[in-house]
Amino acid sequence: MNHSLLAPKLALMQLSDSFFPSGSFTLSHGLEALAQGEQIHSIKDLEIFLQILLHNKLGTTDLVALIHAYRGSKREDLDAVREADHQLFAQTLIEKNREMGRKSGRALLMVARETWQDTQLETLEKETAKGTINGLHPIIFAVVGRVAGLSETDTGLAFLHSFITGLLGAAIRLNIIGHLQAQKILLKLAPDLETTYQKATEINLNEMFSCTPLIDIAQMNHQNLDYRLFAN
């Protein structure tokens, strides 16, 4: 593996790019249902939706599990990675979200195995195939970040960036915003990404929580929509 000064920077761009095929582009995280129900129809509505997800869900569950999985991977402690996966699965109460977390995680793992050579990735591939680990997307992303030579901070920020850009892409496809508006929102949310990451570093696995009731209901109602562009 190339351990030059540029390699981690290039890996950071690769992992956070929407071009990286992790399957997350198929997810709207409730945005589609809220848009069809006319609960989100403006730029301000979308910004609030993203901020709620960042501060009340992503930064208090997914990102927390990712950080602990990264630390476990860094010290070659796969039991810690498995525990983070188990705890995050238990915190993910909506069945469809569990299913999509597995699918996108395994899609990411498949791409990573073809891209990087690493014994942890090999072990995780075997364990997800056996069903002994869920292989949720944030957990796999954590290990891939470590394998790619990223720091804990860069891995966490790459995860947040890819999550937000994925949702902004969904908002464009749902005709809520245009491309220029998406870029403005992404820039505006930069302080939220930083705050979300910093807070997540201070949360233990057994302290994870989420509080997004309206979004949760929208995600559960998604399967009842007459037409759907997204998987959730």
Curated annotation (Swiss-Prot):
Database matches in Pfam families: UreF (PF01730)
Chaperone is among the record's keywords: yes
Main localization (coarse): cytoplasm
GO molecular function: nickel cation binding
InterPro entries: UreF, UreF_sf
Keyword line: Chaperone, Cytoplasm, Nickel insertion
Keyword Chaperone assigned: yes
Record's GO cellular component terms: cytoplasm
Signal peptide: none
Domain of life: Bacteria
Location relative to the cell: Cytoplasm
Its job: Required for maturation of urease via the functional incorporation of the urease nickel metallocenter.
Similarity comment: Belongs to the UreF family.
Assembly and binders: UreD, UreF and UreG form a complex that acts as a GTP-hydrolysis-dependent molecular chaperone, activating the urease apoprotein by helping to assemble the nickel containing metallocenter of UreC. The UreE protein probably delivers the nickel.
PANTHER family the UniProt entry points to: UREASE ACCESSORY PROTEIN F
Name of the protein: Urease accessory protein UreF
Organism: Gloeothece citriformis (strain PCC 7424) (Cyanothece sp. (strain PCC 7424))
Designated gene of the protein: ureF
